[in-house]
């Protein structure tokens, strides 16, 4: 067992760190039970984990995250394992990313084979897989009943990068009418990213205030209130409206279909680009290929952004545009060095095949029903502490209330081998792998039930060690 992390690591330029990490990873096995039976509080400062974090991680990484004393070392399917050989059932999937689970065998094979063949060649040249991925995205989207005017795809590396591209494309479309047509409308409780353009349409003071002033011309409307949009939209000035069909970070809020139909009509009447951000709710997460597949064609977007699940953990994003957007874009208007690289594109192509499959999507809906029934049962047991079950598919939330704090629930669940995350105003968010086994759903719900039961009796209690 690793007893100490040498002080000399800081004096040798980090040359010995890779070897240390390798030794640490190799000395722990995955022989623990399906879910640990005992409480597993976060590792103390003098543990292997504490030493690693305080000696290697914290001194050399920017302080932008508040993280518990947990160092993940490996994962398989719906389970993660840490440096202390603790096992966790993952109901978070890396924030709705690992849609096919951790260390998926086929994706591992694709990564290995393609890395040995060609990882990157830039967009100065074509490669074998970028066009294939774009073709599959457009074809499967139309065949699934989504974005009826889907035409072309821009490949990039992340969700915020996809939204930046979408906003640029919308600005270019607006300028084809007038230089004054540059304003954008976003919605309360939305989240579109942290780079400057995406941040500007993410109306959360916590994220925006430290970096103001932001991109000018952004108006904020109320979701599900079409009159609030009518007051802001202008044929002369507005170029884009951006919205998540199901808000994730903002609280797992599904937007009403009637509102989205009316919103699209407003956009058409005012020659405004409608952007759907399906970075979290898309690619099978809602039980359909896209969340907007549940909507009539009259509510379909002009631009669709995606990322997260597209690479199952490998960084990749994409922007799908209609013909009217494609027509205003010229060579040199936008670009990316890494976007559409052969490795990411080949992974994305495989993921799209899986999440477009009708049987796969039916199973997502069945798992959603199982989750919803279980969560409703928990909610009914605790009417003073749980309001409603929110969301669609496997993007679900529990609205907490009373003295039950979502941070306490997240910590309590983690201590008992279950990973969940928060969203919005005191909402517990559940976004597991789309292929999570039914028995894992049941076991995770049992842990969640016990944790909420104990916290509802004593919000600051510790889960039983027995």
Swiss-Prot record:
Organism: Debaryomyces hansenii (strain ATCC 36239 / CBS 767 / BCRC 21394 / JCM 1990 / NBRC 0083 / IGC 2968) (Yeast)
Name this polypeptide is given: Acetylornithine aminotransferase, mitochondrial
GO cellular component: mitochondrial matrix
Top-level taxon: Eukaryota
Family: Belongs to the class-III pyridoxal-phosphate-dependent aminotransferase family.
Entry EC no(s): 2.6.1.11
GO MF annotation, one: identical protein binding
GO biological process: arginine biosynthetic process via ornithine; L-arginine biosynthetic process
Gene3D superfamilies according to UniProt: Aspartate Aminotransferase, domain 1 (3.90.1150.10), Type I PLP-dependent aspartate aminotransferase-like (Major domain) (3.40.640.10)
Cofactor(s) recorded in Swiss-Prot or TrEMBL: pyridoxal 5'-phosphate
